[in-house]
C-alpha cells in the first residue's frame, strides 16, 4: 500500500521533469541557427586566421598611407574620479575606457564618453561592486586642430548628489557652436538619460538640463540616437539586469515584455542571485532586448513606446533616412527597420556580421558616396573580451573587428573584402540581396598601437576630415586615431 502511494507521488513528478526537459530540448532545437552561428563567437577564442593588425589602406595593404597613434589626454584633477594621477597621487579624470564616441561634421569635433571606473561598475556585464566614482565627457577638435588632445568638457549644474557613469550618447546639432547631448547613465539606483546642452565659445561646456527616467523606456539604456531636441531612440539591451532597479520599475519593464500576470513572480525569480546567470543567458537566447522611442516635454513629461523588440542584447542604434539600424550583439548582426511603419506591419532585415557588434555610427558622406554607411565595431570572441575585462594585461587582450555596412543593389560584393587577411564571408552566412559588408579594421589585440575589445568606430573619409578613423574600447586605454583613411 505504502509502495503504491509512493509510486503515485513519484510518477507525476517524473512526468513534470520530462515535460520540463522536453520543453528545454525543444527550445534549444528551435535555436539551432543561433547555436551554429553564435556559438563559435560566444564560447570560443578568436580564430588563428585573425591578423595581429589590419587596417584598410594601412601597412598590410597595397598602399600604406594610414598612420595610427593613441590619443592620450592629460590628467584633470577630480576627487570623484576613479584613476589616480601618478605625478600627484591625487584622483584625476583621464580619457580611458571610452565606451562611446560621437562625431559631428558640423561641429568638427568628436565627443568621448569615458568611465575608467567601469572595472568595478558595469550594469550590463558586471561587476556591480563600487559605483562611487564618476566618469566624464571629453571632446577632440579633430578638424581644426589635427594634433589636439582630448579636453575635458565641464558639466555645469549637474547635481553633486548624482553619480555619473556615462555609456552611450547621441548629439542633436543646432549649429556649429551649439548642440544637445543625451548620455546614458548607469547610476547606482537605476539607469537614466542625462540631457545636456553644449555650447562652444572658446571651449566646449555642457549645461545640465534634466534627467530622463522611465521604467520601460530607460530600463537598461545602452545606445541612443536623437532625432530631435525632445525625441530619441534608446536601445535597452536586456530585461535581466545585474543591478535590479526599484521593484515597481522592474515589474513594469517585465510586464511590458512578458505580461502583467507574470511580472510579480518573475521579479522574485530574476532577483534571485544564484540563478542570475541562467536567466541572463535565457534573456539573450529569447531576445528580450528592445528599442524604445522616448519623447519628453519641457514641462517634465516623459512618454515612451516600444519601437522594436525581440532583439538579442540590443546595442548600437542609428537612424539613416527612413531606416533604423540596431546592433543585435547576441545575434551577431544588424536589424534594419523602416521607422515609419506601424508596429503591426513592421518587418526587419537581418544583416549578419562576422563578429558580435557593439556600437554603430554613420560615416560622413563623401564625393564617392552621397549617403552615409553604417560602421559597426565589435568582438570576434566573447570569451576573450570577458577575460580581458577580468585580467587587463598585455597577455590578456581581446580581438577587434570593424566593418562598414551599406545597401546598394546595383553593385557587386565580389571585391568588397579584397586584401582582407580574414574576410568576413568566411565567418558569416550569405548576405541578403544588395547588402555589403566591408572590413575596415581587424586586430588580435596584441599589436601596438592598438585597441582591445573595440566598441565604437568613427570615420570621416573626407579631405577636410583628413581621413580620420577612430576606434575605442570598453575597458582599454586611450582611443586610437588613424589618419589618411580616405574613401
Describe each PLM feature range:
Residues 32, 36-42, 46, 320, ...:
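Loop/turn-rich, solvent-exposed surfaces of beta-rich toroidal or solenoidal domains
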Residues 36-97, 147-156, 205-209, 301-302, ...:
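A short helix->beta-strand "capping" segment at the edge of beta-propeller domains
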Residues 92, 97-100, 107, 116-175:
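Blade-loop segments of beta-propeller domains
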Residues 94-103, 158-173, 208-231, 266-270, ...:
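Beta-rich, blade/repeat-based domains predominating
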Residues 104, 110-120, 180-187, 232-238, ...:
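Conserved beta-strand positions in repeat-built beta-propeller and related beta-rich domains
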Residues 127-144, 190-202, 251-297, 391-411, ...:
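Beta-propeller blade signature
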Residues 150-242, 247-271, 276-277:
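Asp-box/WD-like beta-propeller blade repeats and closely related beta-sheet repeat scaffolds
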Residues 451-487:
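Blade-level signature of beta-propeller repeat domains, shared across WD40, Kelch, NHL, RCC1
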Amino acid at each position: 500500500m505504502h509502495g503504491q502511494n509512493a509510486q503515485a507521488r513519484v510518477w507525476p513528478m517524473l512526468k513534470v521533469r520530462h515535460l520540463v526537459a522536453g520543453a528545454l530540448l525543444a527550445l534549444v532545437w528551435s535555436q539551432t541557427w543561433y547555436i551554429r552561428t553564435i556559438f563559435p563567437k560566444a564560447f570560443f577564442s578568436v580564430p588563428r586566421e585573425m591578423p595581429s593588425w589590419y587596417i584598410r589602406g594601412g601597412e598590410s595593404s597595397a598602399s600604406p598611407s594610414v598612420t595610427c597613434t593613441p590619443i592620450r589626454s592629460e590628467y584633470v584633477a577630480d576627487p570623484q574620479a576613479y584613476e589616480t594621477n601618478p605625478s600627484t597621487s591625487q584622483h584625476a579624470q583621464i580619457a580611458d575606457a571610452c565606451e562611446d564616441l560621437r562625431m559631428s561634421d558640423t561641429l568638427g569635433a568628436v565627443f568621448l564618453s569615458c568611465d575608467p571606473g567601469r572595472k568595478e561598475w558595469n550594469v550590463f556585464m558586471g561587476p556591480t561592486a563600487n559605483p562611487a566614482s564618476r566618469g566624464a565627457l571629453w571632446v577632440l577638435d579633430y578638424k581644426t586642430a589635427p594634433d589636439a588632445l582630448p579636453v575635458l568638457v565641464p558639466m555645469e549644474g549637474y547635481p553633486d548628489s548624482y553619480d555619473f557613469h556615462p555609456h552611450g550618447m547621441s548629439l542633436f546639432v543646432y549649429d556649429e557652436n551649439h548642440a544637445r547631448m543625451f548620455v546614458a547613465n548607469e547610476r547606482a539606483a537605476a539607469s537614466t538619460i542625462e540631457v545636456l546642452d553644449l555650447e562652444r565659445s572658446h571651449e566646449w561646456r555642457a549645461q545640465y538640463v534634466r534627467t530622463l527616467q522611465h521604467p520601460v523606456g530607460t530600463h537598461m539604456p545602452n545606445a541612443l540616437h536623437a532625432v530631435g531636441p525632445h525625441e530619441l531612440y534608446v536601445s535597452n539591451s536586456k530585461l535581466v539586469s545585474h543591478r535590479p532597479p526599484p521593484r515597481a520599475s522592474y515589474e513594469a519593464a517585465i510586464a511590458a515584455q512578458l505580461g502583467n500576470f507574470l511580472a510579480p513572480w518573475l521579479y522574485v525569480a530574476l532577483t534571485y542571485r544564484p540563478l542570475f546567470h541562467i536567466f541572463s543567458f535565457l534573456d539573450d537566447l529569447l531576445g528580450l532586448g528592445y528599442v524604445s522611442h522616448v519623447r519628453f516635454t519641457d514641462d517634465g513629461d516623459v512618454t515612451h513606446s516600444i519601437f522594436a523588440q525581440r532583439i538579442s542584447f540590443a546595442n548600437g542604434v542609428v537612424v539613416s533616412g527612413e531606416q533604423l539600424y540596431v546592433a543585435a550583439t547576441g545575434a551577431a548582426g544588424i536589424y534594419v527597420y523602416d521607422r515609419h511603419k506601424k508596429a503591426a506591419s513592421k518587418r526587419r532585415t537581418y544583416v549578419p556580421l562576422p563578429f558580435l557588434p557593439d556600437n554603430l555610427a554613420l560615416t560622413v558622406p563623401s564625393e564617392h558616396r552621397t549617403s552615409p554607411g553604417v560602421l559597426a565595431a565589435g568582438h570576434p570572441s566573447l570569451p576573450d573580451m570577458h577575460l580581458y575585462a577580468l585580467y587587463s594585461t598585455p597577455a590578456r587582450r581581446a580581438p577587434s573587428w570593424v566593418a562598414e555596412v551599406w545597401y546598394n543593389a546595383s553593385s557587386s560584393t565580389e571585391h568588397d573584402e579584397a586584401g582582407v587577411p580574414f574576410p568576413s564571408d568566411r565567418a558569416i552566412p550569405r548576405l541578403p540581396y544588395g547588402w555589403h559588408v566591408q572590413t575596415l579594421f581587424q586586430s588580435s589585440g596584441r599589436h601596438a598601437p592598438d585597441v582591445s575589445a573595440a566598441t565604437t568606430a568613427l570615420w570621416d573619409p573626407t579631405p577636410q576630415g583628413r581621413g580620420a578613423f577612430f576606434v575605442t574600447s570598453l575597458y582599454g586605454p586611450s582611443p586610437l586615431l588613424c589618419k589618411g583613411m580616405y574613401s
